[in-house]
From Swiss-Prot:
This is Septin-5. Residues 189-192 are annotated as: G4 motif. The modification Omega-N-methylarginine is found at R168. One of its GO terms (molecular function) is GTP binding. The modification Phosphothreonine is found at T13, T336. Residues 338-369 form a coiled coil. It comes from Bos taurus. GTP binds at residues 51-58, 85, 111, 190-198, 248, 263. Belongs to the TRAFAC class TrmE-Era-EngA-EngB-Septin-like GTPase superfamily. Septin GTPase family. Gene3D superfamilies: P-loop containing nucleotide triphosphate hydrolases. InterPro entries: G_SEPTIN_dom, P-loop_NTPase, Septin. It is found in: Cytoplasm; Cytoplasm, Cytoskeleton.
């Protein structure tokens, strides 16, 4: 049905602009505000590297972040490595790129998998991860929560030997011990030792064994439906490439008139950043450029929340048991607290109430499932 109305285009007048300004509230600038605040505060990321000695862990970390964290490292002999116990070493460095600051912490695990008897050799590593969760839980439950330092492990790169025929028992034991505590990204180390066909077969074998043993490695998030096709294609290639076959090198060589990082062999040159040679670029893009924030989110929302819920459940059970017990010691009157102490007590009571409510909700959700 025609209304008989005709619309004419006209230039925007100052009055029109004033009307638009009146309708504009301003919350559309919130992303910019968050961006400025985040950049000013800086970011932190904790990466654990694990695997037996000689698989190129230190070299790969140097290649990923272009930072030498192992300047004072002492190389041990074979006998010393066999007798060495598993250690936990932290290396922290502040990196800045285009005004964005990143506090990078590398957690190394020298001695892992090098002993003759490797049973339970992952115990010091699981204890370390739990200690970081415990420290964060204590800081989060304290009164001063403004400057909590996050030392939780956000990602673990686990190096698998290319010389085996899949996962060894120590590989299965390590990943099953940590897969509920940290995001595990399995890597095939020293991929230049294998031809492309061997790499494909080894990847298929590792994927099958991961499913067979019920190991939960880091799952890449699904793409949004409104993403462009190029991004979706890159995401598909990324998922199909796991576990990543990687090569690391700190040496710059000449290849086709260009200086590239790689390794020089009698039969040719292996380029670290050539996607036809290895998956290093895919790993770097995933770890730094596209999925670093998701790794931190999964650590906080899944792994840490599981630990936190377990702690709250234990605390609540203990409080319930204590409340049922009659104390044989007479309760003495407490001195009258001052205003500041009363405020702190109210804050702690309120926090405990919220924790109990959250626990009740979680129990209800578990019953509904």
């Amino acid at each position: 049905m025609s209304t008989g109305l005709r619309y004419k285009s006209k230039l925007a007048t100052p009055e029109d602009k004033q009307d638009v300004d009146k309708q504009y509230v301003g919350f559309a600038t919130l992303p910019n505000q968050v961006h400025r605040k985040s950049v000013k505060k800086g970011f932190d990321f904790t990466l654990m590297v694990a695997g037996e000695s000689g698989l190129g862990k230190s070299t790969l970390v140097h290649s990923l972040f272009l930072t030498d964290l192992y300047k004072e490292r002492k190389l041990l002999s074979a006998e010393e490595r066999i007798s060495q116990t598993v250690e936990i070493l932290k290396h922290t460095v502040d990196i800045e790129e285009k005004g964005v600051k990143l506090k990078l912490t590398i957690v190394d695990t020298p001695g892992f998998g090098d002993a003759v008897n490797n049973s339970e050799c992952w115990k010091p590593i699981t204890d370390y991860v739990d200690q970081q969760f415990e420290q964060y839980f204590r800081d989060e439950s304290g009164l001063n929560r403004k400057n909590i330092q996050d030392n939780r492990v956000h990602c673990c790169l686990y190096f698998i030997s290319p010389f085996g025929h899949g996962l060894r028992p120590v590989d299965v034991g390590f990943m099953k011990a940590l897969h509920e505590k940290v995001n595990i990204v399995p890597l095939i180390a020293k991929a230049d030792c294998l031809v492309p066909g061997e790499i494909r077969k080894l990847k298929e074998r590792i994927r099958e064994e991961i499913d067979k043993f019920g190991i939960h490695v880091y799952q890449f998030p699904e793409c949004d439906s409104d993403e462009d096709e190029d991004f979706k294609q890159q995401d598909r290639e990324l998922k199909e490439s796991a576990p990543f076959a990687v090569i690391g090198s700190n040496t710059v060589v000449e290849a086709k008139g260009q200086r590239v990082r790689g390794r020089l062999y009698p039969w040719g040159i292996v380029e670290v950043e050539n996607q036809a040679h290895c998956d290093f670029v895919k790993l770097r893009n995933m770890l730094i450029r596209t999925h670093m924030h998701d790794l931190k989110d999964v650590t906080c929302d899944v792994h840490y929340e599981n630990y936190r819920a377990h702690c709250i459940q234990q605390m609540t059970s203990k409080l319930t048991q204590d409340s049922r017990m009659e104390s044989p010691i007479p309760i003495l009157p407490l001195p009258t607290p001052d205003a500041e102490t009363e405020k702190l007590i109210r804050m702690k009571d309120e926090e405990l109430r919220r924790m109990q409510e959250m626990l009740q909700k979680m129990k209800q959700q578990m019953q509904d499932q």
